[in-house]
């Protein structure tokens, strides 16, 4: 990238949001990155009922329309483990600075907390159109038509810590250097 003076702009919503949130800041000033996860189709399922879960249940994501593999990865939260690893590699951020938060509505895609007291919260509709559009048409005056984020949505952002009993895949992050 440096050799060809090319800028890397991620397309995935969380990583695009980190990139966008860092545009006016340096990673050295970054205190914490919060990647959000919806919790998938089983967020409110009692642990006692996990034995009854079927593959078809896992494929029915409450917020996103995705393919089968990513739907399963989302339901088990292994996709967030991958995204933490990716964020570390792409942005050169230590694992200790990256945390996963549950945000069932999926409007917040990343939260960046800086050591100067500022926090960037990147919010957009639950569609990949937003990061893809902004990656392709960066710094243009084109407009994207999406559902508008409104005050009703912003009044209920609902963030929670990850329950590792419910999502044991997240424990894999404890084994990373």
PLM features per residue range, with description:
Residues 1-177:
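Catalytic, metal-anchored helix/loop core of enzyme active sites in primary metabolism
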């Amino acid at each position: 990238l440096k050799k060809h003076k090319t800028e890397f702009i991620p397309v995935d919503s969380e990583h695009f949001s980190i990139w966008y949130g860092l545009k006016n800041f340096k990673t050295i000033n970054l205190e914490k990155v919060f990647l959000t996860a919806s919790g998938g189709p089983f967020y409110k399922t009692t642990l006692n009922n996990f034995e009854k879960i079927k593959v078809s249940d896992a494929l029915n994501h409450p917020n996103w329309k995705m393919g089968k593999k990513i739907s399963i990865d989302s339901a088990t939260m292994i996709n967030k483990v991958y995204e933490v690893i990716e964020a570390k590699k792409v942005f050169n951020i230590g694992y200790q600075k990256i945390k996963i938060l549950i945000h069932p509505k999926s409007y917040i895609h990343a939260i960046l907390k800086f050591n100067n007291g500022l926090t960037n919260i990147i919010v957009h509709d639950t569609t990949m159109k937003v990061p893809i559009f902004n990656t392709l048409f960066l710094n243009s005056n084109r407009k994207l038509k999406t559902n508008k984020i409104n005050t009703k949505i912003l009044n209920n952002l609902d963030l929670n810590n990850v329950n590792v009993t419910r999502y044991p895949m997240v424990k894999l992050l404890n084994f990373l250097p």
